[in-house]
Regions:
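Glycine-rich phosphate/pyrophosphate-binding loop at beta-loop-alpha junctions
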Residues: 2-5, 12-20, 24-27, 69-73, ...
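Acidic/glycine-enriched connector segments
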Residues: 1-53
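Short, solvent-exposed amphipathic alpha-helical segments in soluble enzyme
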Residues: 2-3, 66-71, 98-101, 134-135, ...
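Short acidic-hydrophobic, aromatic-tinged amphipathic segments that line or gate anion-handling sites
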Residues: 30-39, 115-126
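Metallocofactor- and cofactor-centric catalytic cores in central/energy metabolism, strongly enriched
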Residues: 1, 148-160, 173-225
Length: 225
């Protein structure tokens, strides 16, 4: 059901054995039909602010791994990926076990990559994972080798110092600093009021960058102080 018909748009794939979209969006003008999986995946990754994966077949695996791969390699911006099971279900639990026992054990992914997704069978926990991701963090973009992380609230000086101490390895050179918007962001004037933290990013280990975002979201703000 998602956000309901009024606040949703659908990305349907034309298959010979599934002729219609789900009932909550079927027949709506905002339902987009695709002939190819790759264009459908491109659209949902580009437009999504979060993704929730439910138990499914090869198509579900394809889409989950596509989103994870694009985020892990920096080809898409980080956003919450929640793998939600029915209460007491084991679908994603055993999926994660496979990832751990094979991909991670063989060194094909890093332990930090596990920060890029959340496995749960609790709907409220899934909702919290998405909502809390945007508690202080707003968005980010790159200007040259600098990453500009936009914040809904400015951080305290102590919080910025703590980020520098804990996440120095993601910084290519210099330090993490808090500042106002850059001139290069003038194409996004609607968010120029937001505070930023800026640093030269190594552009690798995006699981660690996700951990930095998580740390930002539990940081002390300047207002709170």
């Amino acid at each position: 059901e998602g956000a309901g018909r009024q606040d949703s748009f659908g990305l349907n794939i034309a298959l010979p054995f599934e002729s219609t979209a789900n009932s909550f969006i079927a027949g709506d003008a905002k339902l987009i039909n695709f002939n190819y999986f790759f264009t459908r995946k491109l659209s949902f990754v580009k437009e999504a602010d979060a993704a929730v994966g439910l138990p499914g077949g090869f198509g579900t695996m394809d889409e989950v791994f596509e989103a994870l791969t694009l985020i892990q390699t920096g080809k898409a911006s980080i956003y919450p990926i929640v793998l939600l099971d029915a209460e007491g279900g084991t679908y994603w639990k055993f999926w994660k076990q496979f990832i751990d026992e094979h991909l991670a054990r063989l060194g094909l992914i890093s332990q930090n990559d596990f920060s890029l997704f959340k496995v749960t069978d609790d709907v409220e926990e899934a909702v919290s994972e998405v909502v809390n991701f945007y508690r202080i963090f707003h968005s980010y973009r790159y200007v040259g080798d600098q990453i500009i992380i936009r914040l809904n609230e400015a951080l305290s000086e102590e919080a910025v110092a703590s980020l520098n101490e804990e996440f120095s390895e993601v910084v290519k050179s210099g330090t993490i600093v808090q500042q106002s918007c850059l001139e290069e962001e003038d194409d996004e004037s609607e968010i120029d009021r937001l505070s930023r933290i800026v640093f030269r990013h190594r552009r690798r280990d995006f699981g660690r960058l996700r951990q930095l975002i998580d740390a930002v979201n539990v940081s002390e703000t300047a207002v709170a102080k």
